[in-house]
Swiss-Prot record:
Pfam families: Globin (PF00042). Disulfide bonds: none annotated. The epsilon chain is a beta-type chain of early mammalian embryonic hemoglobin. Keywords: Heme, Iron, Metal-binding, Oxygen transport, Phosphoprotein, Transport. Heme b binds at residues 64, 93. One of its GO terms (molecular function) is haptoglobin binding. It comes from Pithecia irrorata (Gray monk saki). The gene is HBE1. InterPro entries: Globin (IPR000971), Globin-like_sf (IPR009050), Globin/Proto (IPR012292), Hemoglobin_b (IPR002337), Hemoglobin_oxygen_transport (IPR050056). It comes from the Eukaryota. Residues 3-147 form the Globin domain. GO terms for cellular component: blood microparticle; haptoglobin-hemoglobin complex; hemoglobin complex. Heterotetramer of two alpha chains and two epsilon chains in early embryonic hemoglobin Gower-2; two zeta chains and two epsilon chains in early embryonic hemoglobin Gower-1. This is Hemoglobin subunit epsilon.
Length: 147
């Protein structure tokens, strides 16, 4: 289990409160699909993913990205119990979707980049470290069923 300090929790929740989940979620998933094109195989029913502009403009990518980032909201509400929070999603991604758990880590790293671009100077080294810790812990929780 990962322990978050009061300062880390404050850094995470402060930024999260300012986040446009719909915009950032679509951008994060879209960038994942562009930068790591092999991840597109999990989204073959999303239509046109033939180019970066097609991916970033794809309404299904944006909608699913919002859904993914909304689940990060659950992580923020339950930072002290991520394994339980993501148990069902871990099972779904492992047993039904067969998603390589490495993809969770990649998406987390993309999310940190999105945060940095959206929040600029507010995204201090301390804030970055707290978010990196969170996305890493979420990736581990999502990959739990694989072990």
């Amino acid at each position: 289990m990962v322990h978050f300090t009061a300062e880390e929790k404050a850094a995470i929740t402060s930024l999260w409160g300012k986040m446009n989940v719909e915009e950032a979620g679509g951008e994060a998933l879209g960038r994942l699909l562009v930068v790591y094109p092999w991840t597109q195989r999990f989204f073959d029913n999303f239509g046109n993913l033939s180019s970066p502009s097609a991916i970033l403009g794809n309404l299904k990518v944006k909608a699913h990205g919002k859904k993914v980032l909304t689940s990060f909201g659950d992580a923020i509400k339950n930072m002290d119990n991520l394994k339980t929070t993501f148990a069902k999603l871990s099972e779904l991604h492992c047993d039904k979707l067969h998603v390589d758990p490495e993809n969770f880590r990649l998406l987390g790293n993309v999310m940190v980049i999105i945060l940095a671009t959206h929040f600029g100077k507010e995204f201090t080294p301390e804030v970055q470290a707290a978010w990196q810790k969170l996305v890493s812990a979420v990736a581990i929780a999502l990959g739990h069923k694989y072990h």
